[in-house]
Amino acid sequence: MRSWDLSDHEVEPQKPQVLGTAEEGRAVLLSLAAGDSMPDHQVRERAVVVVVSGQLAIEAADGERVTGGAGTMVVFEPSENHAVHANEDSRFLLLLAPWSLEEHSSLDPWSPED
């Protein structure tokens, strides 16, 4: 078993910290300073965003918007465009699934990347 205290784990704004990777998925902890954004983008995998602290405004390409604090969870289907904006200093967990180890063969399963 491995565990993390996501509210206290070291992560700098705009510098994602990969917590682990396996074929079942990838876990990434991110931090955004108040006013910072991740502009409209997409990923091949299903993306699950879980707000750990702060407040995020998360918007889908169709204009649907969710604003929420700690405990808010938003799910995007594969290739669904979305954007994230920090209304205040925020950290959030991003889960990507499934994660193809074949396509990302240089990664060691469930080992942090340096």
Regions found by a protein language model. Give the residues of each.
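A short hydrophobic beta-strand segment most commonly corresponding to one strand
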Residues: 75, 88-104
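A short, N-terminal "cap"/entry segment at the start of jelly-roll beta-barrel domains
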Residues: 1-28, 59, 69-70, 108-114
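Glycine- and acidic-residue-biased ligand/ion/polar-headgroup-sensing regions
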Residues: 45-61
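Short acidic-glycine-tyrosine-enriched beta hairpin
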Residues: 62-79
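A cytosolic small-molecule/anion-sensing beta-strand core signal
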Residues: 52-53, 69-70, 88
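Short beta-strand segments in beta-sandwich/barrel cores
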Residues: 27-28, 36-38, 54-59, 73-74
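Short beta-strand His + acidic residue motifs that chelate non-heme Fe in jelly-roll/DSBH
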Residues: 38-40, 58-59, 76, 81-87
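Conserved short histidine dyad/triad with adjacent acidic residue
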Residues: 12-13, 26-43
